[in-house]
Amino acid sequence: MDPAVLQAITALVVDRVDWTNVDLLLGIEAMGLPLTAPLSVETGVPLVIARKRSYGLEGEVEIDQSTGYSKGAMYLNDLKEGERVAIVDDVLSTGGTLEAVIEGVRRANASVTEIIAVIEKGEGLKRLRDLYPDIRIQSLVRLVMDGEAIVLLDE
């Protein structure tokens, strides 16, 4: 990823999230690592990653992740009861991954307060907003496929 693009994404997310309502950043493996690490450094908010393999640690939460594109398990570690979590994801399409992660965070007795996706395509964001009206869910870029063309939409 180009450093200038990563800096721009970091700056946009820093400006759009209510950091007074966040105790922990959560990224989703693998693109969650380069997206959330600079955010953690910039904001001073600790970071955890939803991983695709188990570490078998005490308190680990297994997530049954099923999307329109893949199926499998993910694992959450280091969530503390009562923590307020901001999830950062690279692409939000169907919302299946984020829905599974939200439910995993809740099983750990923590809460998701913010979700920000770098790219939104499809109806996943709307679906998640309908399912979770208490969570602030947004994207930086919204794309629509128009036949063979990709169309960038304004809010």
Segment roles from a protein language model:
Residues 1-88, 92-155:
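PRPP-associated nucleotide enzymes
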